[in-house]
Amino acid sequence: MRAIAVDIDGTITDKKRRLSLEAVKALRGAEEAGVPVIMVTGNILCFAMATSVLIGASGGVVAENGGVLHINDEVRVLGDISKAEMAYSHLKGIYPVRKVQFSDLRVSEIALTRDVPADTVREALRDFDVEVYDTGFAIHLTDPSVNKGSSLEILLESMGIEMEDVMAIGDSENDLEFIEAAGFRVAVANADPELREMADYVTSAAHGEGVAEAVRRFMGW
């Protein structure tokens, strides 16, 4: 294993978005052992960067569900937000949808509060060129040409690391692509059923404690 790619919300944080100290300790330990940690999130870049700095992660950041990358001090916007904007314009004419806090900081996608069920949103947008993800924290309207998996591959290529040499850890449906592509797939105990089914290892602990469990197990600590 040459790198660890890990989701943030619901994976290293709990339902209230509190960061797990156990996860931080384990991920810092991996970094100290020479295994770079990569943040892979649906959240905005500045949030992901702050989390990365707090942990001491050196592997770069995939943000906005693959729509934005931070590689070697360079920010790359890969997702086309105009697709989400068109879909949102249509949607708000039908349902009382609202954008999440700090939406003005998103540059590749739109994230909505979960006031309207995700399946209802998907049905309403079936003729639009967007992907709809429900993370349990927000409903994301994204450019379908990018996702966490495809953007992680770009980041890893810059690091000279193959996907098969990565342990990926996640919890929700927007993690499916990058978990599926990784060499070793980990689902925390609170993960969605589909993610648990594809995982090579499902932790006994939930959220950040599950991340710590997986890292320690496969680092041989």
Swiss-Prot record:
GO terms for molecular function: magnesium ion binding; phosphoglycolate phosphatase activity. Its cofactor is Mg(2+). Keywords: Carbohydrate metabolism, Hydrolase, Magnesium, Metal-binding. It catalyses: 2-phosphoglycolate + H2O = glycolate + phosphate. Substrate binds at K148. The active site is at D7 (nucleophile). The keyword Magnesium applies. Mg(2+) binds at D7, D9, D171, D175. Its EC number is 3.1.3.18. InterPro entries: HAD-like_sf, HAD-SF_hydro_IIB, HAD_sf, PGPase. It is an enzyme of class 3 (hydrolase). GO terms for cellular component: cytosol. CDD domains: HAD_Pase (cd07514). Gene3D superfamilies: 3.90.1070.10, HAD superfamily/HAD-like. It comes from the Archaea. This is Phosphoglycolate phosphatase. It comes from Methanothermobacter thermautotrophicus (strain ATCC 29096 / DSM 1053 / JCM 10044 / NBRC 100330 / Delta H) (Methanobacterium thermoautotrophicum).
